[in-house]
C-alpha cells in the first residue's frame, strides 16, 4: 500500500529531508539534524508539517450538547474562539485518543461548527467512534482537512513571524485561542484557521490552510531563517515538555487518572459520559499505576518496554525515552506502581541487560521562562 504524502512533499525533496513511514504517511524525521532542529525551536523558531494529523468537523445547532457524552471534560468550559485539550474514552475508561476541540462558533443559518484535531494513527477509529455513538440526524461529521496543509510554527519568535506574514496582530488571542478568517493579501477567498497551540512547550501556532497558502508561508518562513523540523525533534521537544504521545504513553488500556490527565475529568459537572462509572471508581478507590518522569544517569537511553526496578522488584515500565538536548541527560516517561511513584524516589532502569541509576521526577522536564 502506498504511503500518503503531504501536499508539501516537494518541499521535503527540495530540502533533502530524511523520510520515514509514520502512521501510513511518508513524513520527514529530520532536515538538518535532530539536535539543530530541537535547539532552533527552543531558542528561536522551527516549522513542522503536521499534515498527517486528522481534522474532523462537527456541525449542528448546539453541537456540544450532542458530543458532550464522548468526553469527560465539560465542553461548556470553553467558548467561541477557544480550544480545549481533552480525551475521548471507551466504556472501560481507556483513552481512545487525546485531541483538541476548537469552537468556531456559528458559521451560518444558526449552525455552529467544532473542529477536532486528532492523532494521525487514530483518525479512522475516532471518526467511526463518533459516528457510532451519536445521533447523526442532529449533527454532521466530515473530514475537514481534505487536501489542506496543517503546519506548526513553534518557538519564542513564532508569534512575531506569523504577524509579519498575515500583516496584523494576534496579541488579542489568548493561549489556546483560535481564529478562522480571510487574509485578503494572502488568499482573498480562503479562510485560514490558526490557533495558539503546540506540542513543544514553547509559544506556537498551528495553522490549517490550502496548499498554495502553505507554500507561501513555508517559503516566507524559510526566507526568515526559520528551521524546517521533522518528527524526531517534535518527539524530543514534547517529551521535555511533559506531553503524551498516543500509542506509547496513552492507549485504550490507560485511563486519564493513570496517565496524569485527571484534570480533564470533570466528575463534578455531573454530565453522563462514556467511561464515567469506571473513572468514578478510580477516583474513589485510587489507581494501581501512574505515569511519571524519569531522569537517568549516564548516556544510555531508556526506550519503550525497559523495566524500572526498586531493588529486586520490577515496579514499572518505560513508555517513552530520549536524550534531552536541553537538559543534556537521558529522560523518560514510565508507568510506575503507585506505591513507588514518588518524586525523588531513586530507582534503576534495565537497558539492554544493564542497570542504570535513575530518579523519579515530574513529567515536565522543561518550562519556558518568558
Curated annotation (Swiss-Prot):
<dbReference type="GO" id="GO:0004047">
    <property type="term" value="F:aminomethyltransferase activity"/>
</dbReference>
<dbReference type="Pfam" id="PF08669">
    <property type="entry name" value="GCV_T_C"/>
</dbReference>
<keyword id="KW-0032">Aminotransferase</keyword>
<dbReference type="GO" id="GO:0005960">
    <property type="term" value="C:glycine cleavage complex"/>
</dbReference>
<dbReference type="GO" id="GO:0019464">
    <property type="term" value="P:glycine decarboxylation via glycine cleavage system"/>
</dbReference>
<dbReference type="GO" id="GO:0008483">
    <property type="term" value="F:transaminase activity"/>
</dbReference>
<protein>
    <recommendedName>
        <fullName>Aminomethyltransferase</fullName>
        <ecNumber>2.1.2.10</ecNumber>
    </recommendedName>
</protein>
<keyword id="KW-0808">Transferase</keyword>
<dbReference type="GO" id="GO:0005829">
    <property type="term" value="C:cytosol"/>
</dbReference>
<dbReference type="InterPro" id="IPR006222">
    <property type="entry name" value="GCV_T_N"/>
</dbReference>
<comment type="similarity">
    <text>Belongs to the GcvT family.</text>
</comment>
<comment type="subunit">
    <text>The glycine cleavage system is composed of four proteins: P, T, L and H.</text>
</comment>
<dbReference type="InterPro" id="IPR006223">
    <property type="entry name" value="GCS_T"/>
</dbReference>
<comment type="function">
    <text>The glycine cleavage system catalyzes the degradation of glycine.</text>
</comment>
<dbReference type="InterPro" id="IPR027266">
    <property type="entry name" value="TrmE/GcvT_dom1"/>
</dbReference>
<dbReference type="InterPro" id="IPR029043">
    <property type="entry name" value="GcvT/YgfZ_C"/>
</dbReference>
<dbReference type="InterPro" id="IPR013977">
    <property type="entry name" value="GCST_C"/>
</dbReference>
<dbReference type="InterPro" id="IPR022903">
    <property type="entry name" value="GCS_T_bac"/>
</dbReference>
<dbReference type="InterPro" id="IPR028896">
    <property type="entry name" value="GcvT/YgfZ/DmdA"/>
</dbReference>
<dbReference type="Pfam" id="PF01571">
    <property type="entry name" value="GCV_T"/>
</dbReference>
